[in-house]
Amino acid sequence: MGCTTSKPSRTPILISLDGNIGAGKSTLCSALQAAAPELTVLQEPVGDWLTLQNEAGESLLSLFYKDTPRWAYTFQNCAVLTRLIATKKALEEGTTPVIITERSVLTDRYVFADMMYKEGKMSKLEWELYLKWYNAFAKDLPIKGLIYINTSPTLSKERIATRGRVGEESIPLPYLEALEAQHASWFKETSLATLTLSAEDSIDQSIEKIRTFCKQFY
């Protein structure tokens, strides 16, 4: 997290760093954390999704990709819950005016859960229950901006194979293509400040663009 020690005079604001699976979000977050002490960086709670396991030792993340219609609602609830817990903790302990989060509850709601419902992998009842939960507890976080790493689904697929994260080996290309379209639709409709990064940008170039983007919120 950020290197400063004194708490800001007001509640920090949140900037969501988004992109397809395998876009390079985790790598960029790690580099940003080291290079930008004026920012706090909160990485995605993937560890929680991997440690939640059934009797056979299969993680919730693996189960979701193995049988998406069966586990979509369960996983999306888990994703928004674990992210909400981590984000609220970061806000309470925040020592910088801006917190960069690897994805956000908005991503959970407007990209992943919305896509699951539209594709029929969450029922109408499950969707309505999800929205009640989300609207009651998650929608009022101080998210002020979105950053998107624009990466082709094909490149994302290659990077997923390279990193070899357990549970992701079965992700099909059409799923990544659908996620890309869902992200594009969300960014087109949002009223929040946005920044798009190219997959061709170096890590240093991306960090500089993010630091400049975040200055408007200080």
Task: Give names to the regions the model predicted.
Residues K25:
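Conserved lysine of the Walker
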Residues N20:
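P-loop (Walker A) phosphate-binding loop of NTP-binding proteins
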Residues A56-V98, Y117-K121:
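Conserved nucleotide-sensing/catalytic segment adjacent to the nucleotide-binding pocket
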Residues G2-T4, K157-Y218:
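NTP-dependent small-molecule kinase module
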